[in-house]
């Protein structure tokens, strides 16, 4: 234990001397503390051969606090009046430069472009100025503002519709390009359209005549067939009636034949 106390006194004495040196002379740099024997107690006490546990923990805590707070003992260096005067002059120069910087910022072209008011705000300001000069009623002011807003909305809707039409046409063309392997068909000329129309008319007339001629030729044939069927039916009916009439008549030859047989 005496050995450890002697080591702590040595380390404590060195730190106190360093503190006194820093307080007296602020211009000198602080020498770095020597840490040759700082790891000795930890290594010896970790083996568990010397001292009690309570004393060991207290010594370790004291050493840690002394090593962690070296800046608390340092004093803030005092400024001379000459240095204070120089600082004041520099601050006044910086404060005088601020308005010039603001003027330069206000003269920037991009700043003007970005901070320019919108068309709606301009119209609203103009309408407010006109209303204040003329001294009209509030209803007229409201109508003017509403008309301006509606006009702007119509313009925006028209632009959107144009853009949508353009997008649709582009998508349609792209689909045609991908679907048609041979690409786009050539645009038909006026002669081709006229020739096609004439050919279509001729074909229609030919088909119409053929259909109606077939119908007209079939009509008399059907009539004849129906008449023949009717005449045949009448003949058959007449023959059947004649046969019935002939069977009901009495023939003398029959009676004579019967008598002869008896």
Swiss-Prot record:
Position of sequence motif IGT motif: 43-49
Gene Ontology BP terms: positive gravitropism; regulation of growth
Disruption-associated phenotype: Roots exhibit a negative gravitropic response, and grow upward in the opposite direrction of root gravitropism.
Region described as Disordered: 1-40
Keywords associated with the record: Growth regulation
Family that this chain belongs to: Belongs to the LAZY family.
Biological function: Involved in the control of root gravitropism.
Name of the protein in its database record: Protein NEGATIVE GRAVITROPIC RESPONSE OF ROOTS
Protein species of origin: Medicago truncatula
Gene: NGR
């Amino acid at each position: 234990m005496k050995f450890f106390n002697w080591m702590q006194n040595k380390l404590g004495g060195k730190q106190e001397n360093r503190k006194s040196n820093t307080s007296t002379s602020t211009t000198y740099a602080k020498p770095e503390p020597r840490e040759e024997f700082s790891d000795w107690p930890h290594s010896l006490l970790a083996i568990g051969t010397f001292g009690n546990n309570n004393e060991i923990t207290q010594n370790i805590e004291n050493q840690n606090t002394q090593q962690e707070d070296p800046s608390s003992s340092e004093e803030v260096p005092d400024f001379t009046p000459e240095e204070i005067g120089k600082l004041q002059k520099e601050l006044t120069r910086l404060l005088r430069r601020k308005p010039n910087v603001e003027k330069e910022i206000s003269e920037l072209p991009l700043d003007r472009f970005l901070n320019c008011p919108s068309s709606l705000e301009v119209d609203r300001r103009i309408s407010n100025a006109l209303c204040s000069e003329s001294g009209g009623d509030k209803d007229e002011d409201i109508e003017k503002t509403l008309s301006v807003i509606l006009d702007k909305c119509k313009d925006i809707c028209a632009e959107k519709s144009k853009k949508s039409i353009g997008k649709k046409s582009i998508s349609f063309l792209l689909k045609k390009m991908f679907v048609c392997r041979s690409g786009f068909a050539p645009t038909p000329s006026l002669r081709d359209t006229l020739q096609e129309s004439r050919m279509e008319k001729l074909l229609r007339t030919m088909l119409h005549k053929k259909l109606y001629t077939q119908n007209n030729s079939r009509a008399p044939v059907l009539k004849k067939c129906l008449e023949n069927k009717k005449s045949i039916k009448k003949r058959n009916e007449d023959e059947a009636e004649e046969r019935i009439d002939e069977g009901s008549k009495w023939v003398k030859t029959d009676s004579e034949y019967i008598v002869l047989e008896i």
